Curated annotation (Swiss-Prot):
The keyword RNA-binding does not apply. GO terms for molecular function: rRNA (uridine-2'-O-)-methyltransferase activity. This is Ribosomal RNA large subunit methyltransferase E. The gene is rlmE. Pfam families: FtsJ. It is an enzyme of class 2 (transferase). Transmembrane segments: none annotated.
């Protein structure tokens, strides 16, 4: 009974969520697009001509937002071609419906064959921005969940260290709780500037927080 009551309450909140309604109206696949939008508007992360990698991209709302942003500021040549001014690579273990102008690679970004596909798209350019909305499956056991969250953040940090340009940026989702301070310290070890962001589009009951790191301390 309690579970059914919880599900009914969540469904009611979801249906009446203004960001859900806005996403449906504006064609985004998930309300998460507005979290990235708010952070981008505050921190000016996305600019024309950039190479941007979206980790854990499915269902694709973050890539949709980036695509829309890069199409607004595109050069005249890109406009004639109907494309975007920049490069977007989305990666996920799960399948994702195609998005115009977004290169999607399905697979584990730690594996050589996936990295080879990424490098084929990127060429000899370094990545300007890595964004990650990845989240592990949580068990409700605090210690276990903290380890899983930290592991996902570690994967994004390692990817950023290997692929970002020196003045690049990494934005990842994490959760307040056990292990949060350790994740922040890892960001501070790797980046010159670190900030936490809690966009209004994050649900009030959610402990999710986004950590932004800029300018690598030890670029490869």
């Amino acid at each position: 009974m309690a579970k059914n009551k919880f599900n009914t309450s969540w469904l009611h909140d979801h249906i009446n969520d203004p960001y859900v309604k806005m996403a449906q109206r504006e064609g985004y696949r998930a309300r998460a697009a507005y979290k990235l939008k708010e952070i981008d508007e505050q921190d000016k992360l996305i600019r024309p001509g950039q190479v941007i990698v979206d980790l854990g991209a499915a269902p694709g709302s973050w890539s949709q937002y980036v695509r829309n942003k890069l199409s607004q500021g595109k050069h005249r040549d890109a406009q004639r071609e109907g494309g975007i001014d920049g490069t977007i690579i989305a990666l996920d273990l799960l399948p994702m419906e195609p998005i115009a102008d977004v290169h999607f690679i399905q697979g584990d970004f730690r594996e050589d064959n996936v990295l080879a596909q990424l490098e084929e798209v990127v060429g000899d350019r370094d990545v300007d921005l890595v964004i990650s909305d990845m989240a592990p499956n949580l068990s409700g056991v605090a210690v276990a969940d903290a380890a899983r969250i930290e592991h996902v953040c570690d994967l994004a940090l390692e990817f950023a260290q290997n692929h970002l340009k020196p003045d690049g940026a990494l934005l990842v989702k994490c959760f307040h709780g056990s292990g949060y301070s350790q994740i922040v310290e890892k960001f501070k070890h790797q980046f010159k500037t670190v900030a936490a962001r809690k966009p209004k589009a994050s649900r009030d009951k959610s402990s999710e927080t986004f950590i932004l790191g800029r300018h690598l301390k030890r670029p490869r």
